[in-house]
Amino acid sequence: ALDADIQLIVVNNQGCGAEQRAHRLNIPCQVLDHRQFETRERLDHALVTAFLEAGVDLIVMAGWMRIVTPVLIEAFPNRLLNIHPSLLPSFKGLDAVGQALQASVRISGCTAHLVQADVDTGPVIAQAAVPVLRDDSPASLATRIQSQEHRILPWAIALAGLKWRQALALSTNRDQG
């Protein structure tokens, strides 16, 4: 079991599966449609407000297909966890599965990492590899990668939370000492 409480789920597509599941499980859910914001920074200000009001300690960006700005990153330093469908540092950004197939690699996978200002560059928390088969399509490879994302994400959340708690304890001890 994961030592965490879900304080808030934020989605950017109303009616998506995550929103429906949150409602079914009585988890607070907020829709922030990125199309309703003039800039990414304005969206990220709204995210910061929502997360602070909910008392969020760690943000898990699973299925959040938006690049975040320093507004969000600086408000939650080393507390944004992203899951990406490649073995970073290979195949950053969009269409990582397509990039892997185009490069004819034999192994691909997924990476859970902390978010930094440059896309898909933060410290790696966990990775899982999957073979790339000769007859793989983007859909078949993505399906195998996604099953590994589901496997490593809880573990990565636990590790990221532990790192954050340790850093908080060290900071508190320094301030008191």
Question: Where on the chain are the PLM-derived regions?
Answer:
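Anion (oxyanion) recognition and catalysis
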Residues: H23, L52, L101
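Donor/substrate-binding cores of folate-linked one-carbon enzymes
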Residues: A4, N12, A62-L170
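Helix-adjacent hinge/juxtasegments
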Residues: Q30-L32, Q36-I83, L88
